Regions:
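Residues immediately within or flanking Cys/His clusters that coordinate Zn2+
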Residues: 5, 24, 112
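Short cysteine-rich clusters marking metal-coordination/redox-active sites
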Residues: 8-11, 27, 115
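Short Cys/His-rich "knuckle" micro-motifs
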Residues: 17-21, 35-38, 123-125
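Cysteine-rich micro-motifs
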Residues: 21-31
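Short amphipathic, basic-aromatic surface patches that mediate peripheral association
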Residues: 62-70
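Short strand-edge motifs at loop-to-beta-strand transitions and within beta-strands
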Residues: 97-101
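Short acidic/polar inter-strand loop motif in beta-rich domains
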Residues: 116-124
Length: 125
């Protein structure tokens, strides 16, 4: 099962689904919009997660060219989907656009990065 994320276009709330019962996600009295990765017209070289796998961990850098990390334009979070669940790490302006996830014996299957301007980006592993 792939990860699912939704956004409220009214207030900006973001939701990551743990269990999908099929009921529409609602916020501010309206249906939330499903985020589809890699669909916004923007530079993939600055948005696609670049992943290196090491024993028990993965390192993720957002972009083959570092993504900007300024208040107007930054990566808000990175999420790694694994065979048994997932992990998320938050970033803020001024941070380096890279994170490390310790996975133990779990296996990563996809990595997502969310840009405050250009939406959701994903690399399948």
């Amino acid at each position: 099962m792939s990860a699912k994320f939704y956004i409220c276009r009214h207030c900006g709330n973001l939701v990551g689904v743990i269990h999908d019962s099929g009921v529409p996600m609602m916020c501010c009295g309206q249906k939330m919009e499903a985020l589809e990765p890699n669909t916004v017209e923007a530079s993939g070289e600055k948005h696609l997660p670049v992943v290196t796998v090491e024993e028990g961990a993965i390192n993720v850098r957002v972009g083959s060219v570092n993504h900007p990390m300024v208040p107007e334009h930054f990566i808000e979070w990175v999420y790694v989907q694994t065979e048994h669940g997932g992990q998320r790490k938050a970033l803020k302006p001024g941070d380096d656009p890279s994170v490390t996830f310790c996975l133990g014996d779990d296996k990563a299957v996809a990595v997502y990065a969310y840009c405050n301007l250009h939406g959701l980006w994903m690399t399948e592993l």
